[in-house]
Amino acid sequence: MADTGLLISHAFDEKTIQGDELYQKLMLDKLEINSGMLVENIVAQMFVASGHRLYFYSNNSRTNADDRMEIDFLVEKPQLTNAHNICPVEVKSGKNYTTVSLNKFCKKFERQLFTPYIIHGMDMKIDNGIVYLPIYMTSLL
């Protein structure tokens, strides 16, 4: 879904929450919603608007926990540099989160990766080779 407003309106049963009530809950940060879904949709929309194709990675291995991981987006670098042109991107909507899948992915595919990113609602930083970007900087990737 490329329209975040349309996504929000479809996420709620019209009989459950009326327009004014939805607006008030949204403005007062009291909306009970899977914010991860919403933020991932916003990031996907920003990637598409910036000309990126949307790719993701998912492995639900039942036999090997080390292979079990999911990466929200895989972004290609415009130029191939020593086969390191894939940037894994994880989107985090909360303040407290883990990077288990991203760490596993980086370890498994380190020869093909350029820079791993985490898009989150906090300030920019670089920690252990991972670039943490605020959501509004997504379009700069």
Language model: regions and residue ranges:
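A cross-kingdom feature that marks ATP-driven nucleic-acid transaction machinery
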Residues: 1-141
